[in-house]
Amino acid sequence: MIKIKNNEEIALMREAGKITAGALELAATLVKPGVSLIHIDSEIHRFITSHGATPSFLHYNGFPASACISVNDEVIHGIPGKRLLTEGDIVTGDVGACYKGFHGDAARTIFCGEVSEDAKRLERVTRESFFEGIKYADPTHRLGDISHAIQEHVENAGFSVVKEFVGHGVGSHLHEDPEVPNYGRAGRGTRLYEGMTLAIEPMVNFGTADVSVLDNDWTVVTDDGMLSAHYENSILITANGPEILTIL
């Protein structure tokens, strides 16, 4: 069931979104050669809790960390451990913060030092596809309009959208209805309504769209070992278009 948020709930989601965005800005300053993923995770945890929130991902369905940190060919759900970053890595931080019962959810792909031109273009197209999609995030459109715009922008650039994992509603639960695929047909799907809150999250692969889950039962990787990028924000549908809740 899709939950329409009232003004009080929206205010709490704005605060959760600010904390989420702040944690990602902190993560961007920490991504450097020689830094461990577990250090980045611990600093994200410290930031979220110091702002009166709790990490949405910690122990969610058994996930063992406060942030998902995925490197290079890892698409999503990377578990931060002792791995040290190296020059040229691309690092996706996916962060959620729960403030007074409401969640923010966002992700960014961050460069570790100087990266390849291919990596830069992949990140740029992924980020652009989010903004192409939310051009249709208003009550005159349907979910399929967002999904189609994302897919079209990505595939026109020669990249692939991941289809096994999708965006979602967000609110008092980290994952709510509806699902928001990054592919689809314009004019189809659920009608958008004022007060809906959605996590729109293009996951884009440099090569094949095919992915697999590692033996840890969490980390998703590209089947061809090529790079993957991820860009996500929580948004609010308003009469005048989308309000992005997870950008400072």
Regions found by a protein language model. Name each.
Residues 1-248:
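Active-site neighborhoods and metal-handling regions in enzymes and metal-associated proteins
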